């Protein structure tokens, strides 16, 4: 059975590029355009990993990450954060909230796949 990844980003093009790379690597993907939409997908999916943008409307990635870590079915699910900002303060917030990896946009699909393979056990 393929490992399932929730991909959360307000950019349809980022979701498309990342989704294609992940599916080609054998992962199943579920997608959401913002944190609030993604929260609605936590109960119905057994997720192995979550990849979330930081800067999104409605609910940003840090707020979403905090909610994920409080959610009974996903609190132990590793989360990779995507952002255009590489500042230490933002990284510290993400790490404190439970992020396991941080990828700066724009990124090469292989960079994402490398991070995913380190966090998902075969």
Language-model features and meaning:
Residues 56:
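Receiver (REC) domain active-site loop signature in two-component systems and cognate sites
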């Amino acid at each position: 059975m393929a490992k399932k990844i929730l991909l959360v980003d307000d950019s349809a093009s980022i979701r498309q590029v990342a989704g294609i790379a992940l599916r080609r690597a054998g992962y199943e993907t579920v997608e959401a355009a913002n944190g609030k939409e993604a929260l609605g997908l936590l109960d119905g999916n057994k997720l192995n990993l979550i990849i979330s943008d930081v800067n999104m409307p409605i609910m940003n990635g840090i707020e979403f990450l905090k909610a994920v870590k409080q959610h009974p079915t996903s609190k132990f699910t590793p989360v990779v954060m995507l952002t255009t900002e590489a500042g230490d303060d933002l990284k510290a917030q993400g790490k404190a909230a439970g992020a396991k990896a941080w990828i700066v946009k724009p990124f090469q699909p292989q960079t994402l796949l490398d991070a995913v393979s380190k966090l998902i056990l075969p």
